[in-house]
Amino acid sequence: MAKEGNIEMEGTIIDTLPNTMFRVQLENGHVVTAHISGKMRKNYIRILTGDKVKVEMTPYDLSKGRIVYRAR
């Protein structure tokens, strides 16, 4: 269901920020700021520090992203 041109990467939550924003360290070492996608917010999926997540980013701004999946 991903749109054309979006980049999906795996990462780990390293910090929790206000307004459901998170700091995520990607597998390649980069750190991005990410928010929760609407479906995860609607289904009350909780994300804690240390969780493995899948982050979707646009090629236009690689410093921000959207968390689309939390691994168990």
Swiss-Prot record:
Any one of the GO CC terms: cytosol
Entry-linked SMART domains: S1
InterPro entries named among the record's database cross-references: NA-bd_OB-fold, RNA-binding_domain_S1_IF1, S1_domain, TIF_IF1
Keyword Signal appears in the UniProt entry: no
One GO molecular-function entry: ribosome binding
Keywords, in A-Z order: Cytoplasm, Initiation factor, Protein biosynthesis, RNA-binding, rRNA-binding
CDD domains attached to this UniProt entry: S1_IF1 (cd04451)
Keyword ATP-binding attached: no
S1-like domain location: 1-72
Alphabetized Pfam families for the sequence: eIF-1a
PROSITE patterns in UniProt: S1_IF1_TYPE
Chief location: cytoplasm
Origin superkingdom: Bacteria
Subcellular locations according to the entry: Cytoplasm
Role according to the record: One of the essential components for the initiation of protein synthesis. Stabilizes the binding of IF-2 and IF-3 on the 30S subunit to which N-formylmethionyl-tRNA(fMet) subsequently binds. Helps modulate mRNA selection, yielding the 30S pre-initiation complex (PIC). Upon addition of the 50S ribosomal subunit IF-1, IF-2 and IF-3 are released leaving the mature 70S translation initiation complex.
Subunit relationships: Component of the 30S ribosomal translation pre-initiation complex which assembles on the 30S ribosome in the order IF-2 and IF-3, IF-1 and N-formylmethionyl-tRNA(fMet); mRNA recruitment can occur at any time during PIC assembly.
Family: Belongs to the IF-1 family.
Classification via HAMAP family: IF_1
Name the UniProt record assigns to this protein: Translation initiation factor IF-1
Organism, scientific name: Hahella chejuensis (strain KCTC 2396)
Gene name of the encoded protein: infA
